[in-house]
């Protein structure tokens, strides 16, 4: 069976707190799963590890059959996208700067090509009747526009 995600004994420790404790899961391709649990159960930590935003203290996982320990995991992460809890943005960086940083983290090379694909090669981005400058500081964006910016980052 092909798995989109296989996690084996993932553990994440912050100081004296275990956010994940030998967590394992196998998610077959084509299936739909939901992560449900109490606050502090490790749901966000698991997603942050899979997205490459944090490293597990121990254990391993694979995406599309590619181990997290291999450099090719960057290519596997390009096939997924996530907006986790509070969006991870740099408030002192422009919207464009935030998008470029996300592409750098994912190992994507041609940010300008992506901007052209989504019609953002100019300084302005238009969504419905709302126009805003891409160069606005991210902290000045409304929650809706911030969500749009984050969704563009996972295209």
Residue ranges and their predicted role:
Residues 17-18, 74:
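Short coil-to-beta microelement around the adenine-binding A-loop and adjacent beta1/P-loop entry
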Residues 33-38:
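The feature captures the beta-strand-to-loop junction immediately N-terminal to the Walker
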Residues 51:
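Helix-to-loop junction immediately C-terminal to a conserved catalytic motif
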Residues 59-69, 75-76:
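Conserved ABC transporter NBD signature motif
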Residues 86, 92-107:
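Q-loop/switch helix immediately C-terminal to the Walker
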Residues 100, 109-124:
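Conserved ABC ATPase "signature" region
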């Amino acid at each position: 069976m092909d798995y989109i995600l296989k996690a084996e004994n993932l553990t994440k420790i912050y100081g004296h707190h275990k956010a994940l404790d030998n967590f394992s899961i196998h998610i077959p391709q084509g299936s739909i799963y939901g992560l449900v649990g109490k606050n502090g159960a490790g749901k966000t930590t698991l997603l942050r590890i899979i997205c490459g935003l944090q490293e597990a203290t121990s254990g391993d996982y694979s995406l599309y059959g590619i181990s997290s320990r291999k450099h090719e995991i960057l290519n596997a992460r390009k096939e997924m996208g996530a907006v986790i809890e509070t969006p991870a943005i740099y408030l002192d960086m422009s919207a464009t700067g935030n998008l470029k940083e996300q592409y750098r983290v994912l190992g994507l090379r041609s940010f300008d090509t992506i901007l052209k694909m989504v019609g953002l090669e100019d300084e302005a981005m238009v969504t419905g009747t709302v126009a805003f400058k891409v160069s606005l500081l991210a902290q000045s964006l409304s929650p809706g526009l911030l969500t749009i910016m984050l969704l563009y980052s996972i295209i």
